[in-house]
Curated annotation (Swiss-Prot):
Protein name: UPF0758 protein stu1465
Entry's family note: Belongs to the UPF0758 family.
Pfam families xref list: RadC (PF04002), UPF0758_N (PF20582)
Entry binding sites for Zn(2+): H174, H176, D187
Length: 228
């Protein structure tokens, strides 16, 4: 269960933010500021406390749909929309921070980016990230949505865009809607096939990443020779 640390200073969250800064506020206080008001029978701090206690971690808030948010007692249509907008804005800020890096330096860097993009999608998304000679992103393209199985026999679409964009290397990423990131036999077969196709064209497959909601698997990191 989510752990709540009580603040006993007597100051309201907005007053504490003004006096001490947002970084010192607890999750409960920050959520109370976003919620703005409670109900006739419950203060906004108490409501924030109750919402957070019903979660295993703060990340759970980002996974709730509008309907699920509205099912929380005290959270109506307006508050659910505001919360959803806040979560989406936080995601976009994180993406913008990651995008500031001019070069892809590690698989972990890409995994963080893609967990935000597709980690919680209900369908499998197959994404190709095309890079130049400096490992800068030329383009990120969603190649397929639905199931990776059909894509296993069709690496040509991935490589078509690589040639069209004059990419020297690429990274392939797909998500597991289950949230788990361990590769299946199909994932391994697909990686072998796309790697061979890349080698034939002189394009470097830097990695194949599988992402879940909060975890990832890197074929390059987990398989030292990346020969499979």
């Amino acid at each position: 269960m989510y752990s709540i640390v009580a603040e006993e200073s007597g100051l309201l969250p907005r007053e504490r933010l003004l006096q001490k800064g947002a970084e010192v506020l607890s999750d409960q206080e920050l959520l109370a500021i976003v919620l703005r008001t409670g109900t006739r029978s419950e203060s906004v701090l108490s409501m924030a406390n109750r919402i957070l206690k019903g979660m295993t971690s703060l990340a759970d808030l980002s996974r709730l749909s509008l309907n699920e948010l509205q099912e929380i007692p005290g959270i109506g249509r307006v508050k659910s929309i505001e919360l959803k907008a806040m979560v989406e804005l936080a995601k976009r800020i994180e993406k913008a921070e990651l995008a500031r890096s001019e070069q892809i330096m590690s698989s972990q860097q890409v995994a963080r980016r893609m967990m935000l993009d597709i980690g919680d999608k209900p369908q499998e998304h197959l994404v190709a990230i095309y890079l130049d000679t400096q490992n800068r992103i030329i383009q990120q393209k969603t190649v397929f949505i639905g199931g990776v199985r059909r894509s296993i026999a069709e690496p040509r679409e991935i490589l078509y865009y690589a040639c069209h964009l004059m990419a020297t290397s690429l990274i392939v990423v797909h998500n597991h809607p289950s949230g788990e990131a361990y590769p299946s036999r199909n994932d391994i077969d697909f990686t072998q096939k796309i790697k061979r196709s890349c080698d034939d064209l002189g394009i470097c497959l830097l990695d194949h990443l599988i992402v879940g909601k909060s975890t990832y698997y890197s074929f390059r990191e987990e398989r030292e020779d990346f020969e499979l």
